[in-house]
Amino acid sequence: YEIVQGDWSSDVCSSDLGFGIINDYSQAKIDILKPIIDKYFIRYTQKDAGFETSVNENILYCNMLESTYNIAKSLKKDKVVKGVFEAILADTAVKEMSKLHQIYSGTVKFESGKSMIIDHSKGFFIKDKFEGQKIAIFYKFKEEFNLLKEVFGDLLTDDLSVFDNSNKNIALQIVSGREGISLANAKYLVYFNIDFSAVSYWQSRDRLTTMERTTNDVYWIFSKGGIESKIYKSVSNKKDFTLSVFKKTYND
């Protein structure tokens, strides 16, 4: 093996994938690592395999409840929103970015660790827009699945085999569904929320592709006036939505 010179791992953190906690190297210094590890990879692209795909991306905007916008506004101004039993705290920029990311899609995780659905608007928007169509939904936060389940009821599953063998729709967390699976039985891929990772953006939107199906229709559901469009602008340009990007762009 080779010793990599330079502090390439200073931004390594931990990520909770639901089934366990792993080291997250997405913020490692790629410019230092890439020249070392590139020679150990074999790249075989879709073009090399004899086919190329196209992704038709559509962005739809959803009006959230007035109460949702009020919570976001108060959090940005006061850095805390207190309820009768719980509190939403944004005493650091990292927390503010995370809480706004949650709130603008209709859920929030309190300081106690408990999560709550505060707005079903996106869920009903998706249900109404794609009524009668078989869709695959990507969500970001765990509570968002509960929101979608409340809206779709028995028409929603998180089991791929059930999805493939029934008329049910499927909802998967972006980080666990972005690679290694096929959602080709869905007519459309719908994003309830968006991830901060550019890798998640590029990998997950190709889940409908097969050799026979080379054109995919993807829909992004953003809250009007929310944070999602800022995230999209960053990750679609192959840049993670980091704290520094949040600070620079969110108030533009």
Label each PLM-derived region with a short phrase:
Residues Y1-D16:
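Single conserved hydrophobic/aromatic residue that forms the stacking wall/gate
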Residues S10, P35-K39:
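Post-DEXD/H (motif II) to motif III coupling segment of the RecA-like Helicase ATP-binding lobe
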Residues F19-A28, N58-M64:
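A short helix-loop-helix "switch/interaction" segment in the helical subdomain of ASCE P-loop NTPases
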Residues F51-A184, Y188, F246-D252:
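Conserved Helicase C-terminal RecA-like lobe
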Residues L65-T68, E143-E144, G177-R178, D195-S197, ...:
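Conserved nucleotide-binding/hydrolysis micro-motifs of P-loop NTPases
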Residues S161-A171, A198-D206, S229-K230:
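Short, charged, surface-exposed secondary-structure boundary motifs
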Residues V175, G180-T214:
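Conserved RecA-like helicase motor core of SF1/SF2 enzymes
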Residues V199-W202, T209-D252:
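A conserved SF2-helicase RecA2
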